[in-house]
């Protein structure tokens, strides 16, 4: 089905750019229909001029159908006859026509059919009488609107029938006039950015100068890139050259009547192109019959059906000479299938054009206002330079304030505009189901990955081709997948929508918060196919806590990539069997679960893991292609690879515990890459390996390997196979038994053997060569492309390389005995890279050579080199760090391609040439040139300029450095000020002036709009707060003399980090600002600061240690995002508000050495917090659930430190003791009686009574008394606990917060340890538990308390919310109100008599535990109506 009114991909053109009709006739039917009008329409039809159907039903009011027809016509012909004004219909039509003339530039042609124009204008004569009759009973407003329209149209240029010799003559001229006007190119597209370039390019493909050719052309490109807009503009431009033309938009349809659909297509096209609405088609082929002799222009838009093309434009020969057919589609294969070879690809606009497009939509001009520049750049970037996105986003932001733009940015960054999504979604919906799946895989997991890598994982080649041909992905020249960021967002939105808000039901997870929820809550389902934690989220402040059964519900999971995150408190018992990718760096497992079979595994990547082995036995590894275990230091063995017949890459770099490879590696006949460098313990290789596909072998840094492996690489033992081979051998002293094919690498000989003839050798790497020269004479090295002789400290000369004409890379780093290079190096015309770093003996390079291809020259560390090297005029990157060069010659101006020049630490360099212009130079690094006092004018091309640690006294004029992005002037102590021309650096992003101790002030009245990073740390003379940019993100002012922060800091809306450490004069911060983006504030060491900073409530990390702050105020609860609060050594601090416990994200709060603290926290606050976090759980549910909830509540306090807080009152100390399940340190000299088992020294044994074996204790609390460290004594920054029972051993280290070396006196250190459920005493039936504590501090005492859980169920009464419980110990008795249900008590091993009373009645149950009598007081809190009492010990006596 065809839809000729479909909206374009880009709603840029005005409404006049989409005209459906050429002519709209307005007339009084009974006056002209059967005479004049019928003759006129016949003439128009003959010239293929389209007009509105005159059979539309007419009434007293104009309906929407006719109103639309008026607006969609290019010309309105108004036929004024005697009775025209008798029709209110006609008069209302005329009013609308006049509006379109005024507002839409519609052309109007009046025809005066036997009436006088002046009578129409003034409503006089017979025409006037008819008009007055019609106006009776009409409102005055309606009458006036008619009069105005009549008066306006009557004076327009038109046709008066009375002035023509015949009606036929006038009609013929009128028709020609209309034809000329409709064929005049429209200017509706003239204001579209870049449109003319597209039109001219397509016109050249169309070969319009050829009058005989019939040409079909395709316009192809991604959805939203503007294909249809370009097509409409092109159609408008070309229409004047074709009498017969049609613009048809395809619209997909469903149905089984294929024949009927084709006939409708033909009718639609012929009606459009011939201007006949009543065409009847009863058989196929009518298009060819009717248009065979006609020169036509046909443009088919948004085509997605080959059948559509075959039906309408089957062959170019169907049409007359000079015809042009243009097909617009997103599917390149469709064009190929229709044999359209001339294809114009619409590419993305440049960044400059994209910005202009955005600005046209948003601001109505070509560039943004100054204060919108950065925002406009970011929006254009978010739109990915896609015209659709640029237009829609620009329009949505048009007329909005800067604040609105800023508030909208997070939404634009994270989501997809609805209008954009609607357009892009069409492309997705048209895909086959399998191609839709492939689209989602790439959008959610694999955008930016290498094609071959993803093809192996997905086992799908067809899908890539389909998505590429439909412009949904692009394959880069180097073989990587590239999907537009808006399409990527579309895919992720589609996947998210299907899950209905439940991350566990999605197919793909790529967001840390979602992954964290699914993994920790174990809510993953069989729907889940892929989990990929993006690299930028690897280092989140929260760990990804993986449970042993986290992946159990994800039985269809195929792709798991969690990078450096994955904290596994206990072993993993399950991995999905369908995994194809397992990528888990730093994995804490010792081996993979025994249930994992690896049958589908394609890529196994576990770098930096704690693995000792992967698995036991032989697994079906037929799909495995890559195994990467590099730097798995504990790995002792590689599993049986007998069935890994498709393995191509094995990376074992740095596996320091690996001794050998299994002999089964010989089955990996497709192995291409084997890297075992730095396998320090590797002793032997399997013998007689036949790895015919091996191309790369690296055994460098394997000092214990004594026999070089005899590997058949290619055709034989002796010769290299044809092709490229690389052998890397370092520390070659062990190469005693090299096979014959490698004997030219025997580094024990004086030099390489004279029969050395490696004609096929492409790369020769002999790093660490022990002798003075490599070989004698000239060798035939015609295939050699790279040579590396680095670390060959005895090498005095390099061999003659005059025949190595293909050599591109020569690496001679750290060849300390080399003094010069031979002049024959001038023959290396293909040499691109020459590295001679740390060749300390090198004094000079040849001067009469010009290596025409040399782009990179690195002579860093050649400390004897005094002359500037000029061995190539095409150098791009030149590194001369730490050389003895004292002067740069003016001939450096010949290096027109030089992009980077590094001369760091050239201490003899004093001046630079002033009369050169390095037009390509972008990076200049002169850091550490301590004799350099002046600097010439900076060229326009410079982007990165580093002048750190120089003697420069002033900065030159910066007016031309308009492209400078990064400027470093650190430690330029002679600099006092900066030039005002710094204001010209509108592209400057980072500016550093650390330790410029002479700097007193920065220029004012400048706003560096792009500046994000400003570092003035150590500018100890700087007294005024710098306000040189309102867009700063990171601001460093450590150790400056600033005493006051102005309230204008509130303008820094993008400021994320403010660091003002050691600003000792700073006393107060403004209170009337709220920096909405500030996340990190560091005021540590501001010793005069007395008040808590209140400049932002969005802070996440707040550093206030060593300040004079006296109170943490109540409003701390407003800091809802706070995760870190450092206030140690605040000697004046006295009070900490209990509201600090309302901060649910707080993970670390350190008040060490706050010796004045008296009040800290509050019982009621903690209790309320815990009540909020523990929810009702059915009695039948595993008791561990309750403890997990308590554990998470305790996480709020897990990083609280009160070391050396000697004035803590009793309430605060008791609170810390009973509520913390994680490490805490505070002053103390003896183990509290709360700990039921105590002993002197560092160990104790707990005897578990037989009566307690039915109990479940899930954790213990421990406490040790430690002495402060002696001066000079080494220490471990952690406490280690060893627990032994029934032959099992637990070990736990507490390192993050147990900085015991900072303690000034004896301290208590509390910690908690959780047992695994399978090790409960009721399951293992053990009688005692041994505890051993280890610490660098001497441990004076230790204590332990076992934490028990008991369940009580009673089905008789469940509706009562308050009950009584009497706890008796010895002779003491206390009544406590308690809600009925689940009793959670950490009873220790005390003898407790419990009586559970229901209301005021008799006890319904009692429990008695035998043992020594011990009184314990408890505080009981109630979760109302949920049946969960929670008991907290108050004290032990």
From Swiss-Prot:
NAD(+) binds at residues 28-33. The active site is at residue 93. Its EC number is 3.2.2.6. GO terms for biological process: defense response to bacterium; response to auxin; systemic acquired resistance, salicylic acid mediated signaling pathway. It catalyses: NAD(+) + H2O = ADP-D-ribose + nicotinamide + H(+). One of its GO terms (molecular function) is ATP binding. Expressed in guard cells and epidermal cells, but not detected in mesophyll cells. Disruption phenotype: Impaired disease resistance responses. A gain-of-function mutant in SNC1 resulting from a point mutation leads to a dwarf and curled-leaf phenotype and a constitutive disease resistance in the absence of cell death. The phenotypically unstable bal phenotype is caused by a duplication of the locus carrying SNC1 followed by a hypermutation of the gene. The TIR domain mediates NAD(+) hydrolase (NADase) activity. Self-association of TIR domains is required for NADase activity. This is Protein SUPPRESSOR OF npr1-1, CONSTITUTIVE 1. The gene is SNC1.
